[in-house]
């Protein structure tokens, strides 16, 4: 007989800086209410995201009945990647009136390539359109 599947008791989605997870909020309270060993998660997450230090990396944590957990890291949010490539701190407060920066078509393609595993797109062109739309809604113009 195949081994019995563990029963899932919770799914937690967080956005944490890579290599900088610690038991302080928001990580501690989110995991604590599900009875997960917080330090164990922090060590595992920090080890898994060490190479992406400085970026915000979303994580999806699945908590099981026996309080064990598994987690899947995602690609950094598109908005963060756009800000990084445009070299700005934050997007425009009035995106359709005030433009704050420019990104080239090549930069959009690069971001789309990075985000491809997490995007709901069939090919790179569709992914580029999604990223360009995100850039426009942040007040960043796409050149080319």
Swiss-Prot record:
The keyword Nucleotide-binding does not apply. One of its GO terms (cellular component) is cytosolic large ribosomal subunit. Part of the ribosomal stalk of the 50S ribosomal subunit. Interacts with L10 and the large rRNA to form the base of the stalk. L10 forms an elongated spine to which L12 dimers bind in a sequential fashion forming a multimeric L10(L12)X complex. Keywords: Methylation, Ribonucleoprotein, Ribosomal protein, RNA-binding, rRNA-binding. InterPro entries: Ribosomal_uL11, Ribosomal_uL11_bac-typ, Ribosomal_uL11_C, Ribosomal_uL11_C_sf, Ribosomal_uL11_CS, Ribosomal_uL11_N, Ribosomal_uL11_N_sf. This is Large ribosomal subunit protein uL11. GO terms for biological process: translation. One or more lysine residues are methylated. GO terms for molecular function: large ribosomal subunit rRNA binding; structural constituent of ribosome. The keyword Hydrolase does not apply. Forms part of the ribosomal stalk which helps the ribosome interact with GTP-bound translation factors. It holds the Pfam family Ribosomal_L11_N. It comes from the Bacteria. Belongs to the universal ribosomal protein uL11 family. Gene3D superfamilies: Ribosomal protein L11, C-terminal domain, Ribosomal protein L11/L12, N-terminal domain.
């Amino acid at each position: 007989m195949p081994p019995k599947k563990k029963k899932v008791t919770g799914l937690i989605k967080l956005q944490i800086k890579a290599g900088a997870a610690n038991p302080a909020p928001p990580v501690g309270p989110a995991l604590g209410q599900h009875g997960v060993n917080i330090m164990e998660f922090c060590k595992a997450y920090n080890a898994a995201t060490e190479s992406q230090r400085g970026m915000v990396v979303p994580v999806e944590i699945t908590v099981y009945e026996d309080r064990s957990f598994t987690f899947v890291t995602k690609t950094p949010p598109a908005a963060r990647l756009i800000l990084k490539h445009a070299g700005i701190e934050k997007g425009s407060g009035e995106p359709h009136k005030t433009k704050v920066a420019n990104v080239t078509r090549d930069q959009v393609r690069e971001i789309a390539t990075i985000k491809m595993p997490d995007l709901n797109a069939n090919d790179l062109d569709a992914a580029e359109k999604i990223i360009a739309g995100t850039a426009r809604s942040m007040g960043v113009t796409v050149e080319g």
